[in-house]
Amino acid sequence: MRKKVRALFDQVVENGEKYRLIVGYTEDVKRFNYGFVHGSKTQIGNLIVGWNEDTKTIVAVPTVPDLSGCGDPTYYRREEILKAYRNKYPTDAFIIYPDRNGYIGINAYEWLDDEKLYVYLYQKEELEAFTAFFQNSFSTK
């Protein structure tokens, strides 16, 4: 599984081997209101997240739970972003605002139970390293 994650990342990210990797997900919550029925619907997007401490860059690559393919990478360079911080509530997420028009919330985990919705990979050490990088080198707060 780890090799498949690495292969997908390296295939779409130039100099991908220079990045450390974790898997995570982002949630897109759509609010709806149809008269008496209202609520929200959440879409889960799986991500391969790479970070390079030297260039202070995070790259998010969308993927699917079975890692059968991936989308185009999005680069978040520390000197180009508007702000970045770790959000503890309601979920533990790494929030990056590339500009005033939008943001990405990266949720990462040591392990998960639901392998149909998420990429499953035990990643305690990698997550600790990413958290330290984000807090110490990338966060704007």
Tell me what each language-model feature is:
Residues 25, 31, 55-57, 82, ...:
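A generic structural signal for solvent-exposed, polar alpha-helical segments
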Residues 2, 12, 18, 69, ...:
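Short linear sequence motifs
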Residues 42-95:
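Phosphoinositide-binding peripheral membrane targeting modules
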Residues 74-75, 79-141:
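Acidic, Ser/Thr- and proline-rich intrinsically disordered linker/docking segments
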Residues 2, 9-10, 19, 58, ...:
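Low-complexity, intrinsically disordered short peptide segments enriched in small/polar/basic residues
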Residues 30-34, 57-60, 66-69, 101-112, ...:
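Short, surface-exposed beta-strand/loop "edge" segments at domain boundaries and coil↔beta transitions
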